[in-house]
Design a protein with these regions (language model features):
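N-terminal periplasmic "start-of-domain" segments of outer-membrane beta-barrel proteins
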Residues: 40-73, 101, 120
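Extracytoplasmic beta-strand/coil segments of soluble accessory domains associated
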Residues: 79-120
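Short acidic/polar hinge/loop motifs at secondary-structure boundaries
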Residues: 119-146
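Flexible loop and strand-edge segments within Gram-negative outer membrane beta-barrel domains
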Residues: 212-233, 241-304, 310-328
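Gram-negative outer-membrane beta-barrel transporters
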Residues: 394, 487, 491-495, 515-598, ...
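C-terminal beta-signal and adjacent terminal beta-strands/loops
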Residues: 497, 588-598, 622-682
C-alpha cells in the first residue's frame, strides 16, 4: 500500500469512528455545576454574542480568549491562536523544523508557564514544539495571565501563565467537526463528541489528523520552507459527579512525524541525491491525568482536591548527521484545600510534588565516526504553598501568596507573589503585581532545534533561572450611548538574577548557551483600545513597546531577533442576522537587532546588523448556518518574507550554514478554506 493510501486510511478511520460514536449519542441537556474544579476560570460566562476576548474580573492581569475570538482565524493549533492578540507574539523559531515560538512581555515562551486545565504541561523536550500539540478546535478558551500570578500552579511562571481549557465531557451532548485545507497543501481534520452515559457520568473523545502533501520552496534555496508534518492526536476524557464528589480524568496520545531539509520533495527524491541534508523529527507522547475534588462546606466554598498528571515524551531528532534522542518522563501531583474564612477572607493551601527524568543521547557533530553522548537528568521537587485573598465589596482585592520548594538539585528556594486590584469608580480597574519565578533549564531538550545550525554548539554549566517581575495596569470601560469603549494600559518589568543566555554574538563559529554574567531585563509598555458597536462592528487597536536587553560577552546589548515594537489593528463585522462575519487583522512588527554577522567564504557578510519593520495582513470571511459554518481566508497577504532565512544553504554541512536566525515570516501569502460542523449544541 502506498504512503498516500496509508494517510488516507488513517483519516477515514478517525472520522468513521467519531461518526459512529456520534450516532450513539443521547442528546439530553445536562446542568452540572463544576464549581470546585473550575474555580480558577469562573470569572466569566461566555456566550456567542459577547466579546471574543474578555478581561477577567480577578485580581490578576488576565485576559480570556474564547471560541468567538478563536473563530476569527483558522487557528489550526495553539500556536496559531494568538493571531489577533496584541499581547502575545508568535513566530517560527527557525527555518528548519517549523517549530512555533511565542513571546510574552518581550521574552521567550520558555518563561511562560504552560497549563492545560490548571495543570503544568509541555515541559522539557516537549517545549520547543508544544504549540502544535494542541489542536485549535479542541479548545474552549485560553486564559493569558501576565506577570506575577497565583502560586497554586507552581514556581515556574516568570512572565506569566497560559492556561488552555478543552471542551468538556459534561458539556451539552453533541458532535463537532472541522476540516481545513490551504494552498500550501496542508490538510487538517478534527472531530469531538461527548455523551452522557448516565446521571453524573459523561465521556468525550477528541481526534485530530493533519498532513501536508508535498513540499514548498518559495525562495528557491533548495530547502523546504516548512516541514511535512503528519500528526495523529487522540484524547479521551471522563467526568463523574456524585453528591459532593467530582472526578475528572483522561488519557491522550500524540504521534507525529516531521520531515524537512534539503531537496524539494525528499520523500521521493532523496534517493536521487548523493548526500542530502535531511531533518527528521519523530515524536511519541502519552499523557494521563486525574482530578478528584470533594466539597466539604458549600456555604464557605470549602473543598479539598487532588490533581495528578503523568507524561512520557519520546523524541528522535536528526539534523543531518547530528542527532538528539530523548525519553522523558514526568509526574506531577498537587493536594489543595480552599475555604472562605469569612465574607472578606479566603485561604488556599496545598502541597505539590514533581519528578522529571530525561534519558538523552546527543550527537553534536556530522562526523560519522563520532558516537552519541549519553546525558541523564533527574530532578524531584516537593513544595508547599499558602495563599490569602482579601476582598472588600467590589472595590478592593488583595492576594498574597508564598510557596517554599525543595529541589534535589537546587535545595530550598522561596517564591513570594503579591497582587492588588483597586476599583475607585465603576468601570476603572487598577492593578499592581510583584513576584518571583524560578525555572530549571534542560538545555538540550529545550534548544535541540539549534542543532540545525552549522556552528559548534556549546552548553556551559547552568544554574536555576531566577527572576523578579513587576507590573502596573489600568483598564477603563466607558459606554457612549449604545457603544462600548475599553481602554487598557500596562507596564511590566522583568529583572533576571540568573538566566541561561543563548549567545550568537561572542564567537561567530560558536553558538553558546551560557550562564548570565551581568544584567538581563525586559521593559514592556502596551496600550490598547477596543470599540464595540451594537451594529455588529467592533475593532481593537494596540501598540506595544519592548526594551529587552541582556549581557553577551561582557556587553549589555539588545536581545537579538526581537521586535522593538508591535502595532495591531483588528476589525470584525457581523451582518444583522449574523449570517456573515468578516474579520481582518493588520500588524506592523518593529525592527530589531540581528546577531553579530560573520564573513562568508564568498566575501559577503552573513546578514546586516538590524532588521526592518514588516507588515502582515490576515483576513477571513465566515458564513454561518444552523449546524455548520464555512470559512475562507488568507494569511500574510502582504506577502512579506524574510530574505535568505537559510544562510549558506548550498553547503549545509559547513560551519557557515545557519537556519536558526529567523525574525520574520519564512513563507509568503497563503489562502485557506474550511468547514465547521456542530450538532446537538446551541
Amino acid at each position: 500500500m502506498t504512503e498516500s493510501c496509508v494517510r488516507n486510511t488513517y483519516s477515514i478511520i478517525i472520522i468513521a469512528a467519531l461518526v459512529a460514536m456520534c450516532n450513539t449519542m443521547h442528546c439530553h441537556a445536562q446542568e452540572l455545576s463544576d464549581t470546585t474544579l473550575s474555580s480558577e476560570l469562573n470569572e466569566v460566562v461566555i456566550t456567542r454574542k459577547r466579546s471574543g476576548t474578555l478581561k477577567s474580573v480577578s485580581v490578576e492581569n488576565k485576559s480570556i480568549i474564547n471560541q468567538l475570538e478563536l473563530f476569527k482565524a483558522a487557528c489550526c493549533n495553539l500556536g496559531e491562536s494568538f493571531t489577533t492578540s496584541p499581547s502575545v507574539d508568535v513566530s517560527y523559531s527557525d527555518a528548519a523544523t517549523g517549530a512555533r515560538q511565542i513571546k510574552l512581555l518581550g521574552l521567550s515562551g520558555t518563561y511562560v508557564q504552560m497549563l492545560t486545565e490548571s495543570m503544568p504541561a509541555f515541559r522539557g523536550a516537549a517545549l520547543p514544539y508544544s504549540f502544535r500539540y494542541v489542536p485549535g478546535p479542541w479548545m474552549k478558551s485560553i486564559s493569558v495571565s501576565k506577570g506575577s500570578s497565583t502560586v497554586k500552579n507552581g514556581y515556574e511562571s516568570i512572565t506569566g501563565q497560559i492556561n488552555v481549557e478543552y471542551l468538556k465531557p459534561q458539556d451539552e451532548p453533541g458532535f463537532t467537526a472541522n476540516a481545513y485545507f490551504d494552498t500550501d497543501m496542508k490538510l487538517e481534520l478534527n472531530a469531538e463528541g461527548n455523551i452522557k452515559i448516565k446521571e453524573g457520568l459523561s465521556t468525550e473523545l477528541l481526534a485530530h489528523f493533519e498532513d501536508r502533501f508535498g513540499t514548498h520552496d518559495g525562495n528557491h534555496d533548495g530547502f523546504a520552507d516548512m516541514p511535512d508534518i503528519r500528526q495523529v492526536n487522540l484524547n479521551n476524557r471522563w467526568q463523574w459527579r456524585s453528591g459532593r464528589y467530582i472526578f475528572h480524568g483522561g488519557i491522550a496520545l500524540i504521534n507525529e512525524k516531521s520531515e524537512a531539509g534539503q531537496i524539494s520533495d525528499h520523500r521521493h527524491a532523496a534517493a536521487d541525491m548523493s548526500d542530502p541534508y535531511i531533518i527528521d523529527l519523530y515524536t511519541r507522547r502519552y499523557e494521563a491525568y486525574m482530578k478528584h475534588a470533594y466539597v466539604i462546606d458549600s456555604e464557605r466554598n470549602g473543598n479539598i482536591a487532588l490533581m495528578a498528571t503523568a507524561n512520557m515524551h519520546q523524541l528522535d531528532a536528526n539534523f543531518g548527521r547530528k542527532g538528539y534522542w530523548v525519553n522523558e518522563k514526568d509526574i506531577y501531583a498537587r493536594l489543595m484545600y480552599e475555604t472562605d474564612l469569612s465574607e472578606h477572607h479566603n485561604l488556599s493551601a496545598g502541597l505539590s510534588l514533581s519528578y522529571d527524568y530525561l534519558g538523552q543521547h546527543l550527537k553534536t557533530t556530522h562526523d560519522p565516526d563520532c558516537n552519541p553522548e549519553y546525558i541523564r537528568e533527574r530532578e524531584s521537587v516537593g513544595g508547599a504553598y499558602l495563599q490569602y485573598t482579601f476582598t472588600h465589596s467590589d472595590r478592593l482585592t488583595l492576594m498574597a501568596g508564598l510557596r517554599g520548594d525543595y529541589s534535589s538539585y537546587y535545595k530550598w528556594f522561596m517564591t513570594p507573589r503579591f497582587n492588588i486590584k483597586y476599583t475607585p469608580v465603576d468601570g476603572l480597574n487598577l492593578r499592581a503585581s510583584a513576584g518571583k519565578g524560578y525555572r530549571t533549564v534542560h538545555p538540550w531538550a529545550e534548544y535541540n532545534n539549534l542543532l540545525a545550525s552549522g556552528r559548534t554548539m556549546v552548553v556551559d554549566q547552568l544554574k536555576q533561572e531566577e527572576a523578579w517581575n513587576y507590573g502596573l495596569s489600568a483598564d477603563y470601560t466607558l459606554y457612549v450611548g449604545s457603544h462600548k469603549l475599553i481602554l487598557n494600559t500596562e507596564y511590566f518589568y522583568t529583572d533576571f538574577k540568573s538566566q541561561a543566555v543563548v549567545d550568537y554574538d561572542t564567537s561567530p563559529g560558536m553558538l553558546t548557551i551560557s550562564q548570565l554574567n551581568g544584567k538581563s531585563y525586559s521593559h514592556t509598555f502596551q496600550a490598547d483600545l477596543t470599540w464595540e458597536s451594537p451594529f455588529g462592528l467592533s475593532a481593537t487597536g494596540a501598540y506595544r513597546l519592548n526594551d529587552v536587553k541582556s549581557t553577551y560577552g561582557g556587553k549589555l546589548l539588545e536581545k537579538p531577533l526581537t521586535s522593538r515594537y508591535k502595532a495591531l489593528l483588528t476589525v470584525t463585522y457581523s451582518t444583522p442576522l449574523e449570517l456573515w462575519q468578516f474579520d481582518a487583522t493588520f500588524q506592523m512588527n518593529g525592527g530589531g537587532r540581528l546577531p553579530a554577522p560573520y564573513m562568508l567564504p564568498d566575501g559577503n557578510m552573513s546578514w546586516g546588523t538590524r532588521f526592518k519593520a514588516f507588515p502582515q495582513l490576515n483576513i477571513q470571511a465566515t458564513r454561518w448556518f444552523r449546524h455548520f459554518s464555512i470559512y475562507a481566508g488568507g494569511e500574510n497577504l502582504t506577502n512579506f518574507k524574510q530574505k535568505n532565512p537559510v544562510v549558506w544553504s548550498h553547503d549545509p554541512w559547513s560551519e557557515y550554514f545557519e537556519p536558526t536566525t529567523v525574525w520574520g515570516p519564512i513563507h509568503g501569502a497563503m489562502a485557506y478554506v474550511g468547514i465547521r460542523v456542530n450538532f446537538g449544541r446551541l
